[in-house]
Amino acid sequence: MNWFFKKKKEELEHTNDLHKEYIELSYEQPQVLFKHSHKCGTSTWVLREFKQMLDSVDCSFDFVLINVFDKRSLSNELARVLEIPHQSPQVLVLKNGKVVDHASHGDILQLNVTQLLC
């Protein structure tokens, strides 16, 4: 599993390019996009539990943590392009250029990540 947290500010200037990058990378391996609010207790709790779930997955994928306060434009652009209304916390699983599943809040912990990613 590859973990991507924050990219350098200059790499994030072109939000359109960044969301396209994640979609393109999903053709190589699944992309797990986690929209997180560090100011929300529920988001922090779900992120911690979800990371534990991902640790048990035995296949290759990228995990991208998107801080919705710092990267609001990226979050909004993903919602627009993927046609999934913005939530936080929210997980979007991309494979082959498409969203294969998504969930928000406590429903994130109900995702069958092994089936989705492997």
Task: Go through each PLM region and give its residues.
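Local sequence-structure signature of Cys/Sec-based thiol-disulfide redox active-site neighborhoods
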Residues: 21-57
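Short cysteine/histidine-rich metal-coordination sites, predominantly Zn2+-binding motifs
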Residues: 55-61, 112-113
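Short, basic/aromatic recognition patches
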Residues: 76-80
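Thiol-based oxidoreductase modules, predominantly thioredoxin-like and allied folds used
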Residues: 35, 59-75
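Short loop/turn motifs at secondary-structure junctions and domain boundaries
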Residues: 82-85
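N-terminal leader/targeting and pre-domain segments
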Residues: 1-30
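Non-catalytic, surface beta->alpha helical segment in thiol-disulfide oxidoreductase systems
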Residues: 87, 92-118
